Structures are given as structure tokens and as C-alpha cells.
Amino acid sequence: MNVHEYQAKQIFAEYGVPTPKGIMAESVDAAVEAAKELGGPIWVVKAQIHAGGRGLGGGVKLAKSLDEVRELADEILGMTLVTHQTGPEGKLVQKLYIEDGADIKDEFYLSVILDRKLEMPLIMASTEGGMNIEDVAENTPEKIITVPVDPTIGFQGFHGRELAFGLGITDKAEQKNIITFAQKLYKLYMDKDAEMIEINPLVRTGSGEFLALDGKMGFDNSALYRQPEIAAMRDLSEEDPDEVEAAKYGLSYVALDGEIGCMVNGAGLAMGTMDTINHMGGTPANFLDVGGSANAETVAKGFEIILKNPNVKAIFVNIFGGIVRCDRIANGIIEATKITDVHVPVIVRLDGTNAPEAAEILKNANISNLIVAEDLGDGAAKAVAAAKGEI
């Protein structure tokens, strides 16, 4: 789960992570009132969407008067902001963050993420603040500093010193400031079950202080039950409506840009299914994991969500029946076709408990667009052929 910048900075404040003062606004008048309350004389008007690259997209602008605040708020609020992370469709700006201007001497990049290879949190930093970190990693990887932190000992002084030296911070007082800053950020990361904290840019002021000029946070969905105050920050309007709808039925759905809809139980099998479709010359239209609940209702909802995509020309159902028997899944698929109008070929591969009986049930159902596959390769090949109109 992601949160807006203004929400991330509220959490930063709880842990004493310094940020400029700011106020969220949902209207032009509220933006002007926020600027008055902050006092100025310089403000930054920021679009609030769940995506990076807002500045380059025209969603972050400087105002030097209240009239400019009004003008920029009117321009940004309600716009569809397109960035390298939103895709060409962009995101509608419904909230603004009005923030005090800052005295910027230098800009850095700082983040805390989970390194899955090292199996521990990783502090990542760079002197190239304000830039797309992916571009820095590709073009000048030597400018990225990585400091792994073993969670059994936590963030220690030597971690902070390694970070400070790597960023070229030599002044003793400034070294102390950046170490304290990183220490607070790491504690926040651990306490709140965060998956990612990113500050870009982290700025050094003329007085040697460090401020989080931006703030992005992502959280582990599986841990939200013990972070109710974080869960309450969820903004469903920023999420894909089909993904939200799928989650209500216990389905994990991610839209892709192919032509073959996929319905699979288990994330690993789902990824393997998509790889096999690609190997056979097709392109998956989605990732859809029905988990262990492949009954008529969930399968019908899965069909409904998949078929919202007008590009889908075939559906490949690939289920391994372990706890749930294949014959029950087969009956569920047949019932689902009665609930939802499935107007494209559906290729079904079932394996596991009672798989032979399931195949007979499907064949005897006499549903013209239901095709039974022998195995994964056969199913993927038939799905690709069906999408091309060859079967």
C-alpha cells in the first residue's frame, strides 16, 4: 500500500524526521488559506498522486505570491498528470500539498528498501538528488552508496558514518545530523512495516541541516492488520479499480497489455503460466491469482474482471487442485460461465486431485467455447492459437 507525500510527512513528523512545513488542500481556496497560514514568502505547490516524476510532469511548481499560489493551484488541481510512472493515461490530481520553500545548498537521494537477495534492509543514497534514481543506476552506478543493515543489530553508528563518508559529508556537525536523520528513518521503516521509504531530494540547507523535501512510502499489505493508522491512510481513488474490486473477492489481479487472460491459483504458478504463454508466442493480458478459493463465485468474478479488458481474445485457466479437488473446480467453472457472459475461448488445464474426472465433466458440459488442455504447454499453445483465431 502506498501513501501520498503529505501522509508520508505526517509519519516522518512522528519520528522527528525534519521536513518543511506544509498543509494539504483539496480546493483552490484551501490552497491559498494554507499558504497564508504557512506565511511564505515562497511556497511550493505540489500535486498529490501515487507516482514519481511529478516535477517533470508539471505537478510541482514554485510560487512567490498568494496570487501565484491561487493561479498554480487552479492549474494543477483537476489536471491529469502524466509522468514516467503513471503511464500515458496519467492520474487525476485531486489533492495539493502547499509547502514552505526551503534554503537548498545541496540535494541528495536517500531511501530504505528491502534487499531480497541480502535478506535485510538496505539504505541507499546518492549525491545525485532530484534525479531519477533508475537513470543514475544505469548511467553512473558508482554514485550510488548502499549500506545493508542487519536487523538483528539494527542501525548503528558505523552505518551512519559509512553513509556520511559516501556522500562526501566531512563537517562533524553535518555528519552527526545525517547520521541522526538516517537513524530515525530506519526506525520508522522497521516500526511501521514499511517496504520502501524514498526521499528525493533530501536537501542540505545553508545551516547544515537536512530536510526531506519529498517523501514516498510503501507498506507491506500483509502487515496492515497491525498498522491500523497506516491502513486508514489508504486512498482507493489512486488504485486500479479492477484490482480493488478483485481484492474484495480474495483475488490478486494486475492488468497487463496482452491478449490472453490468465486465471491461476498460486502466484508462482501464475508467473510460470505467463512465462509459458510468452514462450509460445502469446502475451498475457493480466496476472490473476484466485488462491485456494476457486469456486463458482470467485471464478465468475475473475472472468468478469478479465473481460473488462477489450483486448482479451482468449482466457487460459490453469488450476492445480490440491486442497480443492479438480472436479469441484470444473463444476465451478461451468457454473461461472452461466453467471458471466464469457464470449471468448476458454482453455482449461486442471491437474491434481481428481483431474481425470474434472476433464470428463468439462468435456461433457458441451460448452462450445470451453477447451480442455492436457498440460501446461498444451494449454498455453491452445490459448495462443485461440487468441489468433486459429481454433
Swiss-Prot record:
Report the enzyme's class at the first EC level: ligase
**Pathway(s):** Carbohydrate metabolism; tricarboxylic acid cycle; succinate from succinyl-CoA (ligase route): step 1/1
Query: According to its record, what are the GO cellular component terms?
Result: cytosol; succinate-CoA ligase complex
| DNA repair listed as a keyword | no
InterPro entries, alphabetized: ATP-grasp, ATP-grasp_succ-CoA_synth-type, ATP_grasp_subdomain_1, Succ-CoA_synthase_bsu_CS, SUCC_ACL_C, Succ_CoA_ligase-like_bsu, Succinyl-CoA_synth-like
What Enzyme Commission number(s) appear in the record? 6.2.1.5
Q: Which cofactor does it need?
A: Mg(2+)
Query: One of this protein's Pfam families, by short name?
Result: Ligase_CoA
Residues bound to Mg(2+) are N200, D214
Q: Which intervals hold domain ATP-grasp?
A: 9-245
Which key words are in the record?
A: ATP-binding, Ligase, Magnesium, Metal-binding, Nucleotide-binding, Tricarboxylic acid cycle
Q: Which residues bind substrate?
A: N265, G322, I323, V324
One GO BP annotation here? succinyl-CoA metabolic process
The record's GO molecular-function terms, alphabetically, read: ATP binding; magnesium ion binding; succinate-CoA ligase (ADP-forming) activity; succinate-CoA ligase (GDP-forming) activity
Relay the cofactor remark from the entry: Binds 1 Mg(2+) ion per subunit.
Residues annotated as binding ATP: K46, G53, R54, G55, E99, A102, E107
Q: Which reaction does it catalyse?
A: succinate + ATP + CoA = succinyl-CoA + ADP + phosphate; GTP + succinate + CoA = succinyl-CoA + GDP + phosphate
SUPFAM superfamilies in UniProt: Glutathione synthetase ATP-binding domain-like, Succinyl-CoA synthetase domains
Q: What does this protein do?
A: Succinyl-CoA synthetase functions in the citric acid cycle (TCA), coupling the hydrolysis of succinyl-CoA to the synthesis of either ATP or GTP and thus represents the only step of substrate-level phosphorylation in the TCA. The beta subunit provides nucleotide specificity of the enzyme and binds the substrate succinate, while the binding sites for coenzyme A and phosphate are found in the alpha subunit.
The UniProt entry's sequence similarity note says: Belongs to the succinate/malate CoA ligase beta subunit family.
According to the record's subunit comment, the protein's assembly and interactions are: Heterotetramer of two alpha and two beta subunits.
UniProt name for this protein: Succinate--CoA ligase [ADP-forming] subunit beta
- Gene of this entry: sucC
